[in-house]
Each structure stands twice: as C-alpha cells, then as structure tokens.
C-alpha cells in the first residue's frame, strides 16, 4: 500500500546513496486539512482493518483508514498520533487529512462486509495521500544505515508500535526515499486502558521483533537526538488534533480527559525513555 498526492506536497527526494538515509528534519504539521470522500476505488485487504483506496473532492487519491474498522476509533487515533510524531521526528510520512464520509458514499459497492464498514464509518475518518508507484521496503534487498534504523526503532519503542516487523515492515520506498506508514497498532495501552501510567513506563518487549533492530547500533544516540523534540507544547498541540467524534468510547471520561491521558502517556514515556532504550539495546544484543 502507498500514500500521497502531488510530488510538490512532499520533500524532494535526493538520496542517491546505496544505504537509505535522510536528514533528521522536523516538519510542523499540527493542522490537518479536511476533504469529503467522493469515490470508493478498491479495498486494500491488509489484516483486519480493511482500508481502502478512494478519491476525495480535492481531486486526490487517499488510503482511507476507517474509524468503523477493527478497533474502531482507537485505530485512527493511533494512526494520527503515531504518524504526526514520526513527522515531527523528521521521518517521511504521507500527509494525513480528515476525510468526511457521508451516507451515500460507496453505496454501489457490492461487498456486504465493506458496506457494513462504510455504514459504521460515517463522519470523520483519516486519509493518507496515496504514494503512486511506491514499493514495500524489503530488508533483504534494501539496507538501512545505523542512524536511520536507530531512530525508527526509538520511534516505535516510544509509541509502542508492535507492527513494523519482518512479516509486515510498514515502510515504503518512493523516489529512493524511505517512507513510514501504518501506525494504527501503536498505543496498545488504550485497548485495555488499565494502569495506563504503569504502561507508560513499560520496557516494550515487542521491540525484539522490529525489522530494523539488527541495524540499530546507535539507539542511545537516537534517544539523545529525538527525546528533546517531544516537548510538552508539541504533545499538547498533537492531542488537540483529535476530534471529539473519535473520543466518545469511554463513558467515564470526556474527550478532553481522554486527550489528557494520551498527552500524559507521551510525557511520562518520554521522561522514562531510558527504560525502553535499554530494552531495545538488550534485545539487539540477543540477536548477535
């Protein structure tokens, strides 16, 4: 799967080195555009989430992550938060926008499962620009330099992303640059919501399965570079992107209270980053 609209909306790819690398440039993207979905093109049958390729009224194609799929709103919350954190840390991530789905959208689609999904997803969903012509990253063919690999491992340990493995790398090559996609399996604490403060300090043992861990020799250096970028101000602006519509699933907490939990989770995890850094270093040592 891929994402993105016109090339002009993204940094111009310029890496010609056989090792994949790019500068740790930060991008301020704290306001998401909105558009209305107009045409369902085809389903992208990946796992249980059933995203789709669709067109919006701005004329561009998007990979749509539906709020009615699998884990419902929690998946699009994780996708939005994880993607924008990755962008802040300097990684290439397709532009994310809010996509409004109305009752008439996709009515001609004959698949009953898809019809049920669309009915459950009326309102705001999340779209990623479609990167036409992109290919999946293959660790057996494309080598990653230690700095970039270490920073990606740090990102995924920070946001507790369990889904960047050899089986499913969730990275794309597009114009000789590496792009990160699919962060919907991050923040898995919100699926149980119990003891979230304790989970914020977790070592994240799933990092042992990370596809880039063998290349990540500079995880401490990555921590020193990336941790300061996760400022309180950025985190507050980030969680404020979450629409109320996605925050109605906890009857005990209001949308603002849920936003505060996500913000506090990120702040606590940042302050205790040495815990997950050590876990990643130990896991890598066990691979050698």
Walk through the language-model features, giving the residues of each.
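Phosphate/dinucleotide-binding and metal-coordinating scaffold of catalytic cores
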Residues: 27-288
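Short terminal hydrophobic/aromatic SLiMs and anchors at protein ends
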Residues: 1, 11, 23-24
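Short, Lys/Arg-enriched N-terminal segments with co-localized hydrophobic residues
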Residues: 18-29
